Amino acid sequence: MSVDPVATTPCTTFITLNSTKTASYNSSTAVSIDPIATTPCTQVITINPSTSAVSSSAAVSPSAISSTRIAVTSEVASSIEVPSSVIASSSAASTAEATGSLPTSFEWSSSGPLISAEAGSGIDGIKDPSIVYYDGAYHVFASTAQESGYNMVYITFTDFADAGSASFYYLDQSPIGTGYRAAPEVFYFEPQKLWYLVYQNGNAAYSTNADITDPSGWTAPKTFYSSEPAAITAARGSNAWVDMWVICDTDSCYLFSSDDNGQLFRSSTPVADFPSGMGEPVVALEDSQYALFEASNVYSVGDGTYLLIVEAIGNDGNRYFRSWTSDSIDGTWTGLADTESNPFAKSTNVVFDSDAWTKSISHGEMVRTQVDQTLSISPCNLQYLYQGLDPAATGDYNTLPWSLGLLTQTNSAC
């Protein structure tokens, strides 16, 4: 049994303690007690502080504890009998979470191109990916670019080694429809038990789906605003309103967007009202046009810390990412790795597995295994799916042959 559809890799066993202070162990029913646990766990322990004893013949793995956010604290452990193997595993996981932090500089390795436009499709580039790992597979949503404009595609695979041979489902075949749709973000909105795909269509749009594995199930576009907000129109000039990004905390859902003119905007609505009621956008961060260009991501990295990533255009004309942190989504952003000489990700701090196939590290997304609206990621061993481009490519922007590659952090602090 799984208590929530997001718990796609349920635990195989579980232990609970009842009011009689005895342990109850069940190995025949698979239960996940965390609705966003996608990492397999071999055993789960739930501890009532009033209990005094628990025994088990097997240990709880650190990965299980990490994925379900359960740990045996020293205070609780001192008052109950817990197998040493369980305490050791719990301590290891708790310590890893407590000490895990983002470094102040980043180093990466990169794959070669993993996903490119299908030959004969008429599409020139695959861009702007969003990715989650769910139900034993990676699910990628991306923009398709060609001379006539943009739409979106869905691709799924179980291993990055198979990404290049995965089938494409073009989302203009779904109720999302034809026309301008681009730069998707996907997440599971747990309060409504629905997947959301947020994207741009000249406005800030979204579609929903009860089943991420059914690409035909996405609803027709709806928008967060009836028209472009006045603050955006006034700020962007002749540039575009692009790259919508939603993240929620316990109280509010926030919509970030860029104006390609050096300003990052934020608006919000109560979680209970989402997706309705988005307020007037305010400036969350600003800089010169190319120093704060587009393609923002915001993530929760634990301990009340949020990570912001925004794409910039360097002095060499190539794309790269800057980063900041904050103690709240609507708070002040403090530079982390936020300069061209100390970037979050740029060709200068990336080592390629083979040839350096791109000089631009552009619009992408962290690989997320926790798929809900909080966009929670571990600060350790980051992976980032990004768009890159052959430096020799020329032509109209829409026809450039962007492909997707994978960054893997090589200097994790935890």
Predicted regions mapped to residue ranges:
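Carbohydrate-active catalytic/glycan-binding domains of CAZyme proteins
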Residues: 96-414
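Fungal extracellular serine/threonine-rich, low-complexity, intrinsically disordered "mucin-like" regions
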Residues: 1-99
